[in-house]
Amino acid sequence: MPNIKWFPYTFPNRLNDRPVVEITLHFLPADEIQYPMDIAPIRQCLEQGGILHPNEVFPADPLPNDFTGWYTSLLVQTALLFQSKAGHRVGYYTVCGDPDQSERSALMEHEQCDVGMTAVKLATETISGERKLLAKPFEQFSAFAVDRLLPVDTGSIIAVARRRGIPAIQLERQPYRREQFDHLTGGDCIRRNGLLMLGHGAHQHVLDGLFCLDTSDDFKRLLNDKQGRRDLLQGTGVPVADSGRDDGGAAQRYQYLLVNGQVVAARPVPDGSWAEPGTLDHAVVEHLLQVAHALGFAAVAVTVLTGGEVVDFDLAPRLDQHLESSKNMVLLERAGNLLVDWLFGDVDDTRMPVIAITGTNGKTTTARMVREILACAGDRPGLVCTDGVYLDDKQVSDTDECMIAGHLKVLTSAAVNRAVLESHHTGILRYGFAFDRCEVAICTTVADDHLGLTVRTVEEMAVIKRALLERAMDAAVLNADNEHCLDMVEHLTADKVCLVSTSSVADDLSHQGPEGGTCCCVLESVDDEDWVVIYDTIRVPVVPVASMPATFGGRATFNVSNAMHAIAACYFFGYDVDAIRAGMERFRMDFDNTPGRLNFYDTYPFDVLMDAMKNPAGAAALGRFVEQIKTRGRKYLMVQARGDRDDGFIKAMGTALAGQFDHYICQTHSVYPGEPKDRAPALVKAALLEAGVGEERITLMADLSEAVDTLLRMGSEGDLLVFAPGTGQPKSKVWSQILAFEFEADAGGLERQ
């Protein structure tokens, strides 16, 4: 049988806006012989398992004529059948790939990722013939799926919200668990799988079924307090049924659903189905509205006797229990619309504006620059970057969360009003996006890094990163000096594309993007100074390069580029030049602000620079920067080579660093399981030797702390000591060791050469 792999997305992703399972199939020539294109055995298996009726159409869509397409389409349609028979409302799928190729892929909609994944597994076993008796397995699957079923009314609210552009986040789906919201629910569960957040930040409301959890605590108590509800009814002035008649008696009872002060549906109690309310007695309507008004016009089901007396009300009505047919789905939609009206009224800004950043190098520095500009403009930005998650000025996480989980910490926080979200390729590839669109997106660079089994080429990496830029609405900001960024332009739909270049002129860039929508950010001489200048509909000089401390007078050309990307993004985000200039003049590359990125320490007689460059492009940029630093002494480097990269990558790091330093200490950052620890340093050494660096100028050291201490003891007055540790913990460890070092004039260490 073909080799089949599948992987779920629960949020908008690089492939689709829906939650989907991505299925990849690798076929062998023998598969076509083993599995003739005959649907009859599969259908018989489904009928015998009680899943299909004899007269039921299956598959729903015609199967392709080629074998790989036939097999893939049948697999996906079978998995969809299992889900829909278990009550999950799914139907979308697509099959991709060339019939002449041995690899095919498909996307299949799911309502809950574990159910979707299990459905694919069961479909795979069914089509391969591994399972011929399906009754028991499907019974188990169905029970599993029903337990994770999205309530119909919750689904209706989600659909209404998304049509209006209101974010809808299901809080019982990955990456969340209901228990995380016990502070809202009190540990109670009103509707299983019905916990839902609508809106971002301060605009958010949380629903459990149709009940709004951010309503007053008094209303929450009424959910389980029958006498309290009765007391409230009596306080409204409506006629209230005697306590002896509220649970029976000869009078017929009706329940009326009101949402936002409108009667939406009615049904006979206890077992009638919801239907249009029809013509109601004026007095009954008045009584219903009095109750709804007392409850703030939320969703409420009011039970009334035929004589007009009110029996009780339910603040968390369940509409799905009494829907007789699909015709009544219109009632759900109307209820959903009215509930969203009640929550948000005419408010348009239910979303938190987002600037999203990706790229191989420079994305964290650029994200931090953007955050600084937003803060200078008086906003309260939330930031997600490699160093952690920040809500306004407070760091709430110190780990890399540049993916959905970290992004949601910002988007769901009422402490911030703008989101600056760094996204690395792993987050995009494996998880998708916490938003369906952003205002501005940036791609700083695409270069050789993180290539291997999943992403094999730089071109494939560019396509993954491009998925973020494709979600930009107002502007996409791209590095025109990087060919892979430039290739993205034709795929983008943002209102404007801004091309950033440290070397090209505006006239040349204006012809490289979509006609009428291309802007640029370039360097131009103004009064004999290099300025960052934006060309939109007008020419806008923003800030002199020399006024931005992060550029080190323009010597850190990569930071000039990072700054230009941040400036352009904030300009098209709507910030004025004064705020942008103030932010960039205030932004500095110290360890507290940009840990591991061009951090200088000048307390000793020698200068110390730490930069956690991580790939050949970063190494080359660091080398060019160091070359421009004039010293009275020598230049030394300690580099942590990445042992979790292939030989070519590691040697390219060494080649990029050759010729810039008087001595090299090579150490390793991380290794493949089973690999010798000295593999990466030895490869760097080999590359340095090939580039003409003398062997006496290269030292290999196994221990990081020893390597740092050795280099510090090599330093003398006027020297420059450069530390290039790995990202994550190593940079913090190295910086702490640098600060704790006690300089001694005759410390020794390796012989100073």
Model-derived features: where do they sit?
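Adenine nucleotide phosphate-binding catalytic loops in nucleotide-utilizing enzymes
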Residues: 294, 455-459, 495-620
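ATP-dependent carboxylate activation and anion-phosphoryl transfer catalytic cores
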Residues: 1-162, 259-262, 276-358
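Flexible active-site lid/hinge loop adjacent to a nucleotide/diphosphate
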Residues: 395-512, 616
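Walker A (P-loop) phosphate-binding motif
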Residues: 210-211, 346-388
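Conserved N-proximal alpha/beta basic substrate-recognition cap immediately N-terminal to
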Residues: 107-243
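Residue-level signal for inorganic ion chemistry
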Residues: 161, 357, 384, 422, ...
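Active-site nucleotide/adenylate-binding loops and adjacent lid/helix of ATP-dependent enzymes
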Residues: 199-273, 281-286, 290, 335-336
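ATP-dependent carboxylate-amine ligase
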Residues: 2-63, 355, 553-556, 568-578, ...
